[in-house]
Curated annotation (Swiss-Prot):
Name of protein: Putative N-acetylmuramoyl-L-alanine amidase RC0497
E.C. no: 3.5.1.28
Bias (Polar residues): 10-19
Enzyme class: hydrolase
Length: 267
């Protein structure tokens, strides 16, 4: 089985990489509109390349723990195969319009400063090459675009990923919440009715692929989990963090430009 050959480009992306086996052209007229972050689970680039090839999967870029960046596909013309069944902001099939970036990480450890520093450089480069790509609003985790997937859902890039640090650098958004807010439970697995329906509508408005069912179903749980991981809004000591708290509601309200707690209080 042939392997994709990477270009080592000193950590800054370009659009001259050779096409590997596991890719397809982007649809005509489609340009990247989001960047999707995932992690490898595998310990190094060699191991992750073997896993990707076995699965017929691919990403545009891989960033190693020491900050080394390798490019595998042209992010302007090629769709890599990393998202599968996915959606973002109502658009189905994220591979068609996303740029996939994988960080070497075992899903349990902190991300090294060198790696995150290189990611920031990469994201800055992307914004310069694609001025219409809004990475304050359209930088997402793989888990966020695959919440509507059956079975074992993705949670990448996980709770260790430093979303706050990236937001401080201008990539993504982050809002501080208090321990008191995190400890106040609003909705949980056995919740039903209008409050759940309103939460589902708001998560969908934010961009997640959930539907309004008025029950705290599997896809709502997955959406709440990755939201809590990203914004640090989960119920203290709950693992996985699938309950909805006042902290989560506060952040979601700010993300949507709404009054804090307006939805659940009026439901």
């Amino acid at each position: 089985m042939s392997k994709s050959k990477a270009i080592e480009n000193n950590g800054i992306s370009n659009t001259n990489s050779p096409n590997g086996k596991y890719m397809a052209p982007r649809p005509e007229g489609v340009k990247p509109t989001c960047v999707v972050i995932t992690y490898s689970v595998s310990k190094d680039i060699k191991a992750v390349r073997e896993v990707l090839d076995e699965r017929g999967a691919s990403v545009h870029y891989i960033i190693d723990k020491d900050g080394t960046q390798k490019e595998y596909h042209n992010d302007l013309t090629d769709q890599a195969f990393y998202a599968g069944k996915s959606s973002w902001k109502g658009e189905v099939g994220v591979n068609k319009f996303g740029i996939g970036v994988m960080l070497i990480n075992d899903a349990k450890s902190d991300f090294p400063a060198e790696q995150i520093g290189k990611l920031k450089e990469f994201l800055k480069d992307v914004t310069e090459r694609y001025p219409n790509l809004d990475l304050k609003h359209d930088l997402v985790g793989l888990g966020e675009v695959t919440v509507n997937r059956e079975g074992n859902a993705h949670i990448a890039p996980g709770s260790k990923f430093p979303w706050k640090e990236l937001a401080e650098a201008g990539f993504g958004r982050y809002f501080e919440t208090t321990q008191e807010q995190k400890s106040k439970l609003l909705l949980s697995l056995d919740s039903t009715g209008e409050k759940v329906n309103t939460l589902q509508e708001n998560l969908k408005e934010y961009g997640y692929g959930v539907e309004s069912t008025s029950t705290f179903d599997q896809f709502t749980q997955q959406a709440v989990r990755v939201f809590n991981d990203r914004y640090g809004t989960g119920l203290p000591n709950e693992e996985p963090p699938v309950s909805w708290t006042e902290a989560g509601q506060d952040v979601l309200s700010q993300l949507l430009g709404q009054t804090v707690l307006e939805q659940t209080e009026n439901a």
